[in-house]
A protein has these predicted regions:
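Surface-exposed beta-strand edges and their flanking turn/coil or helix-capping segments
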Residues: 40-41, 53-56, 78-80, 117-118
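Small/polar-rich, solvent-exposed N-terminal microdomains that initiate assembly or binding
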Residues: 1-55, 89-101
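Oligomerization/assembly interface segments of phage tail-like spikes and tubes
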Residues: 57-75, 82, 123-135
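Long, highly charged amphipathic alpha-helices
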Residues: 6-10, 77, 81, 85
Length: 138
């Protein structure tokens, strides 16, 4: 099962997260029409450990989860929920009902904070708290 599918399933399965962002969880880019607060996740890098025969033994995947809000406090609250709930627990695929087993361990590595000017003329800034995690699996 893909790491992208696993990441989305873990984020959207946690009611503590969806209570804050509803269904506003998207990969790689936030649509301009998507309101706040929201989450944008990406998997920008994947390192492979291979055995002598060339087959992949272990994968280390970087997962970035951007928690966006018009309030820096709310962006941090969403980020804390992400850290709490993005664990190596088994996640079930909503469409097939099959357990997604690709991730064996999750390690939070850093948190970054930034802000952006509003794109819509609103006086409120957009605050982004990014949680960086490393997923390890086969």
């Amino acid at each position: 099962m893909s790491y992208a599918k696993w990441a989305r399933a873990v984020i959207t399965a946690a009611s503590d997260i969806t209570d804050l962002v509803s269904t506003r969880v998207t990969p790689y880019l936030r649509n301009r029409e998507t309101g706040f607060p929201c989450i944008v996740y990406s998997l920008p890098r994947e390192d492979l450990e291979t055995v002598a025969g060339g087959s992949v033994q272990t994968r280390h995947v970087e997962l970035q989860v951007q928690c966006m809000s018009r309030s820096h406090v709310e962006a941090d609250e969403i980020a804390e929920e992400v850290i709490q709930h993005v664990t190596a627990q088994t996640v079930t695929d909503d469409t097939t009902g099959i357990a997604i087993q690709c991730v064996e361990a999750v390690r939070p590595t850093s948190i970054e904070r930034e802000f952006q000017d509003s794109y819509d003329g609103s006086p409120d800034l957009i605050y982004i708290t990014t949680v960086n995690l490393t997923l390890t699996g086969a």
